[in-house]
A protein has these predicted regions:
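Alpha-helical bundle regulatory/interaction domains
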Residues: 1-173, 178-183
Length: 187
């Protein structure tokens, strides 16, 4: 994400040692528009899957999405007084929240509710009248509880199932394409 700081309030949340998502997220940040008109911001491909939350000061119409890795520049339209919270996972980590192939989410965003364990709880936390950092800490704890203990469990399970389905007649490159991981990581 690239943006000029004028017209926006930007807060980067500390994710150092002791944070519930330490070692699993690239970063967590909050952006709120102070502009009088809608602004468009570019989202640059970076290999990170993200949870994205959007709302306004009145905590009405809060939306939450699981966003897959993007391989093209996207445009994000931010309305006046609208905010976004981005929790960006390190490559390969975010998919352990889902139990589905990574390539199903490439260049897509799906609603958090109904697609991730703990989704309802996360939305209720966002509606609370508590400080931003506290809400993000609570959300992080819910994510940590629902994050599989090892992100590679998904990959191992998926690759094993595909190898059995194809009776061993599948190339590592095909597994990489299907799973969203690199052939080098799988091999």
């Amino acid at each position: 994400l690239i943006l000029e700081e004028e017209d926006f309030e930007i807060k980067k949340i500390d994710v150092t040692f002791g944070h519930p998502l330490y070692t699993t997220v690239a970063d967590i940040f909050y952006i709120r528009s102070n502009a009088d008109t809608a602004r468009v911001l570019p989202i640059i491909p970076d290999g990170c899957m993200a949870l994205v939350f959007c709302g306004n000061r009145e905590k009405e119409n809060i939306r939450a999405y699981i966003c897959g890795v993007t391989d093209e520049i996207k445009k994000l339209k931010i309305e006046p007084d609208e905010y976004y919270i981005f929790i960006r996972f390190l490559p390969g980590i975010g998919y352990s929240l889902l139990d589905q192939p990574a390539n199903k989410l490439t260049n897509k965003a799906i609603p958090l509710k109904g697609h991730m364990a703990g989704g309802e709880q996360i939305l209720s936390i966002l509606e609370r009248e508590t400080h931003l950092v506290e809400r993000i800490r609570l959300i992080s704890k819910v994510i940590r509880v629902n994050l599989h203990s090892e992100s590679n469990k998904y990959l191992i399970k998926y690759c094993t199932e595909r190898i059995l389905q194809t009776q061993g007649n599948i190339k590592v490159e095909e597994l990489a394409e299907e799973s969203g991981f690199t052939a080098r990581h799988i091999g």
